[in-house]
Amino acid sequence: MGRGKVELKRIENKINRQVTFAKRRNGLLKKAYELSVLCDAEIALLIFSNRGKLYEFCSSPSGMARTVDKYRKHSYATMDPNQSAKDLQDKYQDYLKLKSRVEILQHSQRHLLGEELSEMDVNELEHLERQVDASLRQIRSTKARSMLDQLSDLKTKEEMLLETNRDLRRKLEDSDAALTQSFWGSSAAEQQQQHQQQQQGMSSYQSNPPIQEAGFFKPLQGNVALQMSSHYNHNPANATNSATTSQNVNGFFPGWMV
């Protein structure tokens, strides 16, 4: 997949510019060498860096000077001498104009940086002040637009985060509601099961009552008073105590405890 179209302009970052220059220079030298070997072509390549350092490549065994001389003879041999002189004069005039323009721009740049202001008169200083004010307004306007754009982006991100937060909160509430419903459903089922077990136990208790054990004291069979009275009636000596004995037996305590 291609990287897309690269905009050709000067790289502002100094380090990146140097790195790019080194990579592209080596690539260009390599391509020139490959072309000279593959196609048996005579190639001369001259590269000057922005610091003025020279990098060259020449495929001719005789060297760069001979190749350049060959190029000079080939280029100027077909030119008219009069036309060549006129072109050189025109180019020299263009060079002088460009040089003057560069000097004016450099001078103006130094003024904008606050340098060499002593040689300027009041009108020039006022003109420079208006230029600086216009530049400041332009800079502030650009800064304000940039800050507004950033603020708009931040608001958009904030709305997205709030929407995500609401979705997460809604999911959490639904999860809690489902968990609570499941808990109460299981509790109700357990209570219903316990109630059924209690109902089953009560019905079983009613259908099969427990056998009561005999008490510690058993009831007396028959009329104890009559038995004891008849027993004592056989003995005349005890006839007088029959009533007392009958009362003691019916009251469940002996006479000596009275």
Swiss-Prot record:
GO biological process, one term: petal development
Compositional bias of kind Low complexity: 191-200
Keywords: Developmental protein, Differentiation, DNA-binding, Flowering, Nucleus, Transcription, Transcription regulation
GO molecular function per UniProt: DNA-binding transcription factor activity; protein dimerization activity; RNA polymerase II transcription regulatory region sequence-specific DNA binding
Domain K-box: 88-178
InterPro entries per UniProt: MADS-box/MEF2_TF, MEF2-like_N, TF_Kbox, TF_MADSbox, TF_MADSbox_sf
Region (Disordered) location: 186-214
Domain MADS-box residues, every copy: 3-57
SUPFAM superfamilies recorded: SRF-like
CDD domains per record: MADS_MEF2_like (cd00265)
Tissue and organ distribution: Expressed in aerial vegetative organs and flowers, but not in roots. Expressed in flower primordia.
Protein function: Probable transcription factor that binds specifically to the CArG box DNA sequence 5'-CC (A/T)6 GG-3'. Plays an important role in the determination of flower meristem identity. Involved in the specification of sepal identity. Contributes to the development of petals, stamens and carpels.
Complex and partners: Forms homodimers. Interacts with TT16/AGL32.
Protein name: Agamous-like MADS-box protein AGL3
Gene, per the UniProt record: AGL3
